[in-house]
Amino acid sequence: MFLTLIAAIISFMVSAFTMPYFIKFYQLKKIGGQQMHEDVKQHLAKAGTPTMGGTVFLLVATAVSLLVNLFSIKNTQSLALISGILSIVVIYGIIGFLDDFLKIFKQINEGLTAKQKLALQLAGGLMFYFLHVSPSGISSINVFGYQLSLGIFYLFFVLFWVVGFSNAVNLTDGIDGLASISVVISLVTYGVIAYVQGQFDVLLLIGTMIGALLGFFCFNHKPAKVFMGDVGSLALGAMLAAISIALRQEWTLLIIGIVYVLETSSVMLQVSYFKYTKKKYGEGRRIFRMTPFHHHLELGGLSGKGKKWSEWQVDAFLWGVGSLASLLVLAILYVF
C-alpha cells in the first residue's frame, strides 16, 4: 500500500510538472487544436485548445509503473498480469494517437475512419486475448460469485468489453474534466477491490494511473488548458475493461462505469429513435436535446427543457452518479 502511494505521488508530480511544457510546445509550434461541435455554442471558444494530453499521462503512468514494478513483482504470474493490462493500454493509446495525429497534423477531420478504428481496436483486443487472457485459462465470467462459463465465446466477450468501453470513455470525454475524474473514480473503486483481493501489483498500476490523471486534471478542469484526446480516452476505457477482467469482476464495470454506459446508450437510443421515426413519420425525432448525454444536460438540464447547466454542474452531477454507483458495487461485494 505504501509503495502504491509513493508511485501515485511520483506520477502526479511528473504529470503535473511536464504538462505545462507539453502545452507550451503545442502552442509554440502552432499545432491545430481541438475542434468544437457548433451545436454547443458555449464550447466554440475552446477551439484550438491543445489536445493529445493523454500522451503525457499515459507515458508517465506506464514508465512509473514499469520502474516500480521492476523492484516489487515477485512472480511470473504477477508479471504476466501487469504486462497484459499495460499492453492493452499502450495498444489503444497508439490507436488513439494515430486518430488524433490524422485529425491535427494531417488535417483529416474524421481521423481514422470508423472501419479503420474498429479494425485496429479488434486487432488490439485479439492480441490482448491470445497473449494474456487465453494463456491464463479463463473462459468464464464471475457474476455475483457464480461462474458463467462461455468457453470459446469468452473471446468475443473480451473483444466486446474492451472495444465497447474504450469507445464509451471516448464519448464521455466531451467537457472539461468529465472523463478524467470519472475514470479516477472508477480506478479508485477497482483499487479497493484489488486491495481486498490482495492483488497489490494491480493496485500499484491503478495508483500510478490515478496519480498521472490527477496531474493532468490540474490543467483539464474548466477552463481546460489541454484535452486528453483519443490517445487518452481510448486507452483509459481499455484499461478499465482489462482491470475488470484481471480482477474477475467483469460485471462490476457496468455499474462502476455507469457514466460511460449512460453516455453510450444515449447515442445509440438517439440514433435508433431518429431512424425509426424518420421511417414511420417521414421526419426524424429525438429523445435527447443532443448526445452524448452530457450535452443534453448542458442544453437543458435533466429534462432537456430547463435552464442550461454549466459544465461544472454537469461534471458534479455525473461524478456524483459515478461515485454512488461505485459505492453500490462495493456494498454489494463486501457488505450485503
From Swiss-Prot:
Compartmental location: Cell membrane
InterPro entries the record matches: Glycosyl_transferase_4, PNAcMuramoyl-5peptid_Trfase, PNAcMuramoyl-5peptid_Trfase_CS
Organism: Streptococcus pyogenes serotype M5 (strain Manfredo)
Protein name: Phospho-N-acetylmuramoyl-pentapeptide-transferase
Superkingdom as given in the UniProt entry: Bacteria
CDD domains attached to this UniProt entry: GT_MraY
Pathway(s) of this molecule: Cell wall biogenesis; peptidoglycan biosynthesis
GO biological process, one term: peptidoglycan biosynthetic process
Main localization, broad class: membrane
